[in-house]
Amino acid sequence: MAQAGRPSILNATDDDIKQLLAASCHIGSKNLDVRMENYVWKRRSDGVHIINIGKTWEKIVLAARVIATIENPADVCVVSSRPYGHRAVLKFAAHTGATAIAGRFTPGNFTNYITRTYREPRLIIATDPRADAQAIKEASYVNIPVISLCDTDSPLAHVDVAIPTNNKGYKSIGLVWWLLAREVLRLRGTISRTSPWDVMVDMYFYRDPEEIEREEEAKAAAEAEAEAAATAEAAAEFEVTDSAAGTVDPSVLAAATAGQVGESSWEEAGDWNTTGAAQTSDWAATAEAQ
């Protein structure tokens, strides 16, 4: 997809456009903010506004170029109060070196230096201007530029770079963060443009904790079943070995027989009566001899 105003190497490929369409990044909402009109392609009969995917890619590239200009990656702070963006911002921070704030934004993070969580970032990237309104407002107080994923009904107050996309679906949020991270790494020279990124886009998608628990339970059940099968197999082998070991070893039998033959019997030792009679002398004859 060729666009004017930038090098052709930064243009979106067919696969990028297909991914954006497959993740429903072009599906907006029924409401429309007046400052988002430039990013809307058309309005459907059911009232849903369709976002121009070409504009989405232009803003992804622009945002990536802004992020790449920050010397220290930790000075970039990514924020997501929306649960669908928690995993995406954490993965983005892990791959690009940014600082992530996933979950509730504590008021005063950017303005109150007394708090333990006080930060002085040079750039803020938000998932939703409505959900992350506190972070964007504080960024405006301390003159921090803001990049944000914006839907057709998102307010653009204090947002410097708006990336028009569907910021309510977990797939669209994950894909845009993944594309942004990939483009930043390409601009930094960390990865090559000629080869695909080895990180799957699924890693940026939100996952239900209950689904993770179910997978862990299924894995534990499979391990228990495999262990039970191994135990049963070992028991069967033990039965076969035990029955074979029940036969008497010929060498042991020969040794036992030889021992029995060599033993002396009490009966063979002699009769007590006979021996006593042979040793006893006549008392009367002895007395006469004396």
Curated annotation (Swiss-Prot):
Q: Which InterPro entries match?
A: Ribosomal_uS2, Ribosomal_uS2_C, Ribosomal_uS2_euk, Ribosomal_uS2_euk/arc, Ribosomal_uS2_flav_dom_sf
Q: Name one GO cellular component term.
A: cytosolic small ribosomal subunit
Q: Which domain of life is it from?
A: Eukaryota
* GO MF annotations in UniProt: structural constituent of ribosome
A Pfam family the protein falls into: Ribosomal_S2
Q: Does the keyword Ribosomal protein apply?
A: yes
**Stretches for region Disordered:** 257-290
DNA damage as a keyword of this entry, yes or no, is: no
User: Would you kindly state one Gene Ontology biological process term found in this protein's UniProt entry?
Assistant: ribosomal small subunit assembly
Q: Please provide the record's keywords in A-Z order.
A: Cytoplasm, Ribonucleoprotein, Ribosomal protein
Q: Compositional bias (Polar residues) spans? A: 272-290
- Family the UniProt entry places it in: Belongs to the universal ribosomal protein uS2 family.
The record's section on NCBIfam families has:
uS2_euk_arch
Assembly with partners or alone? Component of the small ribosomal subunit. Mature ribosomes consist of a small (40S) and a large (60S) subunit. The 40S subunit contains about 33 different proteins and 1 molecule of RNA (18S). The 60S subunit contains about 49 different proteins and 3 molecules of RNA (25S, 5.8S and 5S). Interacts with rps21.
Function field: Required for the assembly and/or stability of the 40S ribosomal subunit. Required for the processing of the 20S rRNA-precursor to mature 18S rRNA in a late step of the maturation of 40S ribosomal subunits.
The entry's protein name is: Small ribosomal subunit protein uS2A
